[in-house]
Amino acid sequence: NMRKYLHTKPYFVLLTIILLVGCQKQPQKVRILNENPVLDSAMMAQLQMNIHLADAADRDCKEFVETDSITYAMDDLGFWYAKTITGNTDTVQLGQELLLHLQISEIGGNLISDSKHHHIMGSGELPMAINRSLKMMCIGDQMQIVAPWYTAYGVEGTSLIKPYSNLFI
């Protein structure tokens, strides 16, 4: 019995040491985004600017919908929408080909684009606000969307739409 105990005791001591070492508090690691402080600094500045611009966009969009005669609802993504014409009760299905008529203006401003084009539902080709709105629509519905830039064409824009544009669609 003693021999058995002596053979197991070193394992017990070793196990105890491993557990104690494993329980020591690990030092916090500094998170580096790109391993390059200059790039990290530029990325953080861009992020802070985008947060500031998103807040301003939210204020502008809210002010616009509050002064419009139509009652809008706000989506949890941050855009506002109002169904202005109700079509039939056939919901739009994933993969379905749709004919869309999109009129896009700057909020309270100039018409940027007035176009009809075919779109496959769920293809991801359209901005977030439009894709999400299509999911809420039935065939024949018309909807007005007030979209802050981060749910519209974002920081890049398009050939017609400037970056950071808040849009009325």
Regions found by a protein language model. Give the residues of each.
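Sec-dependent bacterial lipoprotein signal peptides
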Residues: 1-23
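Cross-family detector of peptidyl-prolyl cis-trans isomerase
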Residues: 6-7, 23-169
